[in-house]
Curated annotation (Swiss-Prot):
Signal peptide: none annotated. This is CLOCK-interacting pacemaker. Residues 50-68, 205-222 have a biased composition (Polar residues). The lineage of its organism: Eukaryota, Metazoa, Chordata, Craniata, Vertebrata. It is found in: Nucleus; Cytoplasm, Cytosol. It comes from Xenopus laevis (African clawed frog).
């Protein structure tokens, strides 16, 4: 009975620690154990009863420890939480070598023995973080797309109804330098752009310059080659013409030299013939030969006339007489010509 009372007291302590829900669940088991303890008085029943109570405490310690572990997790919402509590019990585990062969099958051999020591309770203070919990403030007017770019004009939602439109006012003396600086900046930007354009144009011109020079040099060299070819052809033609003229001159010179030689020879022969008297003899022989030819032609004509006369006499044909007259007329003409030639010679 004392052992049963000890088990009951331990169960009550554990129920007080574990909470209201667990206590309510354990109440019917308590009544059952008390009624069974009143009925049974054996040692084995008491041992089994203690074993069941210990098993019940073990099963109930599982969810409670898990609950306390969940409670130990830090949360930023409620800083006021109960302190963590851990209960330590001295349990001795008895591992038997094996069931005895002679033991009855219904006997229960306890495997856990309780020591006669009071349980120890350890309190762990909750760890409080020194850093303050960061609170995220939600901006109802947060627009990431609009705020990621530079603002040109305010968003309609950010405008205030009390803000009035700016009135048209005159420009003061303070605003003129600002406008002038803006103009100067714009002029400077335009000048820099123009300078950049000019620089790019100069770069392109410098890059295109050697190409143009190479093209020009190639064209000039081609033109020079053509001019050289033309000059060479002209020189060849002039040389050919000069050679032809020189050959003609040489021929003329040769002809003139030959004629001069002939004339000199003739003059030399004339001088020699005139000095020797042979020239007059040659002239007379030449004239005599010419007279001889003339007399020979006259003799031939005279023979023809004699024959014509003989035929005309024999035939008394007027045609023959006509032929005779024609031949005589020719002889007369020839004689007159000879006379005129002689007179001219004289």
């Amino acid at each position: 009975m004392e052992k049963n009372q000890k088990c009951a007291t331990e169960q009550e302590r554990f129920k007080a620690r574990s909470g209201h829900g667990d206590g309510q669940r354990a109440e019917p088991r308590k009544t059952q154990t008390t009624t069974e303890s009143d009925k049974d008085s054996g040692y084995s029943d008491v041992a089994s009863e203690c074993l069941s109570s210990v098993e019940q405490t073990d099963t109930e310690e599982g969810p409670t420890t898990s609950r306390w572990n969940v409670a130990l997790k830090p949360s930023g919402k409620t800083p006021s939480q109960p302190q963590s509590l851990v209960v330590l019990k001295n349990l001795l585990v008895d591992q038997g070598s094996g069931p005895e062969p002679n033991a009855s099958s219904w006997a229960v051999h306890p495997s856990i023995q309780l020591l006669q020591t009071s349980p120890q309770i350890v309190f762990f203070p909750p760890t409080v973080s020194s850093s303050k919990p960061s609170t995220c403030r939600k901006d109802t007017k947060y627009l990431p797309i609009l705020k990621s770019y530079t603002k040109i004009a305010p968003h309609p939602s950010h405008r205030v109804s009390n803000i009035s439109l700016p009135c048209a006012r005159k420009r003061g003396p303070d605003e003129r330098p600002h406008n002038q600086t803006k103009r100067q900046c714009s002029k400077g930007h335009s000048g820099s752009r123009k300078g950049m354009d000019a620089a790019t144009l100069l770069d392109t011109g410098v890059q295109q310059g050697p190409v143009d020079q190479n093209v020009k040099e190639s064209s000039v060299s081609a033109k020079n080659k053509e001019l050289d070819m033309q000059l060479t052809t002209q020189n060849i033609n002039s040389n050919e013409k000069g050679s032809r003229v020189a050959s003609l001159d040489t021929q003329q010179n040769l002809l003139s030299a030959g004629q001069q030689n002939k004339s000199q020879r003739f003059q030399n022969t004339l001088d020699i013939l005139h000095r020797s008297g042979l020239l007059s003899i040659a002239m007379k022989t030449k004239e005599l030969a010419r007279h001889n030819q003339a007399t020979q032609s006259q003799l031939e004509k005279l023979q023809e006339q004699v024959q014509l006369y003989a035929t005309a006499m024999s035939s008394n044909n007027p045609h023959d007489w006509q032929r005779l007259q024609d031949s005589l007329a020719e002889v007369v003409k020839g004689d007159t010509e000879d006379l005129s030639v002689r007179e001219m010679d004289l």
